[in-house]
Amino acid sequence: MSGEGENPASKPTPVQDVQGDGRWMSLHHRFVADSKDKEPEVVFIGDSLVQLMHQCEIWRELFSPLHALNFGIGGDSTQHVLWRLENGELEHIRPKIVVVWVGTNNHSHTAEQVTGGIKAIVQLVNKLQPQARVVVLGLLPRGQHPNPLREKNRQVNELVRAALAGYPRAHFLDADPGFVHSDGTISHHDMYDYLHLSRLGYTPVCRALHSLLLRLLAQDQGQGIPLPETAS
């Protein structure tokens, strides 16, 4: 992608502490410290959609048995995840899979820039954890009614899916089970604020992801279970 070196979405950047309470950096330091005595099979990293998943029963049902770690921080964009990865969040562990779900908060960036940021994350994970597979979850539609951000997220997904074709250990999963109804609306039962998932909304997303994770883990153990069609 031309101009990617100047892409703000792919430049590792810490969050500016506008509120002045240091919470973002405190969470980052906690993630680094918590990982020192863990042996996770799977690590999740991303924004609030990752962070809030940890509070749902389905996390305990599906991902706790995989000794999964959750490094989600609300409000993060791609450049923030890159900074966290460059500053130790994967330093003390050797996961088999890293799940990345970020990009919907890159409001001021183009679809091409967001794609560059996600691709930079995949490249960095490959460098830091060459044994690990990377699963990138597609961005979800957002807003009760059709809007430009929803369309941009759709464009990002198309671009990311194509970009990841060049990375043999990276996989794209369309995380949307069909949240947009035939009239173009999204229900508050699935996304309570038309951005964040409800417990009901998390269920199909997590089950599809869990199915893919099990297949990837089995493949790496030589069992050869085929990948689902939604993953590439």
Swiss-Prot record:
A biological process from GO: lipid catabolic process
Main localization category: cytoplasm
CDD domains to which the protein is assigned, alphabetical: PAF_acetylesterase_like
Ways its activity is controlled: Beta subunit (PAFAH1B1) inhibits the acetylhydrolase activity of the alpha1/alpha1 catalytic homodimer.
Enzyme Commission numbers on file: 3.1.1.47
GO molecular-function terms, A-Z: 1-alkyl-2-acetylglycerophosphocholine esterase activity; platelet-activating factor acetyltransferase activity; protein heterodimerization activity; protein homodimerization activity; protein-containing complex binding
N-acetylserine PTM sites in chain numbering: 2
Taxonomic superkingdom: Eukaryota
Positions of modified residues (Phosphoserine): 2
Compartment(s): Cytoplasm
Active site: 48, 193, 196
Function summary: Alpha1 catalytic subunit of the cytosolic type I platelet-activating factor (PAF) acetylhydrolase (PAF-AH (I)) heterotetrameric enzyme that catalyzes the hydrolyze of the acetyl group at the sn-2 position of PAF and its analogs and modulates the action of PAF. The activity and substrate specificity of PAF-AH (I) are affected by its subunit composition.
Additional detail: Originally the subunits of the type I platelet-activating factor (PAF) acetylhydrolase was named alpha (PAFAH1B1), beta (PAFAH1B2) and gamma (PAFAH1B3). Now these subunits have been renamed beta (PAFAH1B1), alpha2 (PAFAH1B2) and alpha1 (PAFAH1B3) respectively.
Name of the protein: Platelet-activating factor acetylhydrolase IB subunit alpha1
